[in-house]
Amino acid sequence: MFCLPQQESTAPTTCTGSASTQDMDSGYGDGLQGECLRKPDQTQPKLYGVGDPTATFSSDSSCLSSRGRVIKWFWDSAEEGYRTYHMDEYDEDKNPSGIINLGTSENKLCFDLLSWRLTQGDMLHVEPSLLQYPDWRGHLFLREEVAKFLSFYCKSPAPLKPENVVVLNGCASLFSALATVLCEAGEALLIPTPYYGAITQHIYLYGNVRLAYVYLDSKVTGLNTRPFQLTVEKLEMVLQGVSSEGVKVKGLILINPQNPLGDVYSPEELQDFLRFAMRHKLHVIMDEVYMLSVFEESLGYRSVLSLERLPDPQRTHVMWATSKDFGMSGLRFGVLYTENQHVATAVASLCRYHGLSGLVQHQMAQLLRDHDWISQVYLPENHARLKAAHTYVSEELRALGIPFVSRGAGFFIWVDLRKYLCKGTFEEEALLWRQFLDNKVLLSSGKTFECKEPGWFRVVFSDKENRLRLGMQRMRQVLEGQSQVVEDASPCHAQEPQSQPR
């Protein structure tokens, strides 16, 4: 986690950060300490939690540029858990004592369905145009299928247009591209926390764009409130605080369904947030990468593209990918839908570096046009498997007396382990994360999502039954041991967990 020492601020809910960690990630790296490459710019405002990201690097420790050292630092410090997992990955036959990964948000439940569909005859096609340079927005045949797909599954009130579609190799590239074309270096985007921490890296490494954190907490203040609830009032407070510190805010990032909370924004909330952005002339980046992974129908999920009227369509940009909903995180495919042709053209220009091969574009077009298979075979079975896995992990957590937040969207449960911390600090959270890893189960810690309350963890449940059972057994072993440690330590007062919806 890259967060420089915080300084006093008159806006305690505001933190502008310049880096974070990856989703696979749950890692607590050691961080690099060394001589400053150069002194921080004295003219830069003393922002809450912000400084010169190159200041921790030795001037003679590497052949890399200062920018290259920052990039390497991310790799060294932010992915320890994921690298450790890959060096000791669990295999039922070859490595039964290896690490179970309940930290990376991937859907591993439907490989049988996907492998069948991706090996059908219509997927195997080669023609000259697929081997030549394409339109950088993506081949027209693919953009037409994407527009039809989003129109149908987002339930848009009018058909979406292929000229508003840009395709590229995943949402990480899309975040990088959007931040670069929408923001000047040093400007910021608002984002509610906890959030998918890799976004900070995506927008910072290329565009030098930062995030202004809208810190949310687990406290429930009334009948109509819920844990970690975003409101317009909180957005206004952080926007004013960051602006008063001399940082220009250019937009708002919303993840819906939410990662790591497994919750969704209501249509009314979406409209409120969009109107807030319009009042302040902010772009809104809507990340809807889990839109087809809502397995509780009672949630009533609505895509922003389903709204009858967008307050500011020229500043509303929607992203989606196959990584989550179709369990294809290794097949890089992401989509931008925007009515702003200046934004679409600028992002398309960057697709020279983030484009898709013609063969992959053909395969994706074939997949997305197969509404019968998607609606009648894949989605019902995927939702059933997600729900069964979610039910199992939820019951295990209840048996342990562990509160959690999860309303039936995505692949994860946001788990409250604060009572297992001897002290309510992120150092204690890191020690607990390390205990899990030492006991061969990888989780994602709350710090990697910029959660303001130490002791929260994200548990991914979208895996096969045997791995889930073993992973939960290993979690239980750690927590039972930690309970004894907390009980024996004196004086030691664990923070009482607040009641959370189950």
Curated annotation (Swiss-Prot):
Pfam families: Aminotran_1_2 (PF00155)
GO biological process: biosynthetic process
Entry keyword Lyase: no
Keyword annotations from UniProtKB, A to Z: Pyridoxal phosphate
GO MF term set: identical protein binding; pyridoxal phosphate binding
Residues annotated as binding substrate: E106
CDD domains xref list: AAT_like
Modified residues (N6-(pyridoxal phosphate)lysine): K324
Keyword Flavoprotein in record: no
Disordered: annotated segments: 1-24
Family annotation (Gene3D superfamilies): Aspartate Aminotransferase, domain 1, Type I PLP-dependent aspartate aminotransferase-like (Major domain)
Family classification: Belongs to the class-I pyridoxal-phosphate-dependent aminotransferase family.
Function of the molecule: Does not catalyze the synthesis of 1-aminocyclopropane-1-carboxylate but is capable of catalyzing the deamination of L-vinylglycine.
Protein name, per record: 1-aminocyclopropane-1-carboxylate synthase-like protein 1
Gene source species: Mus musculus (Mouse)
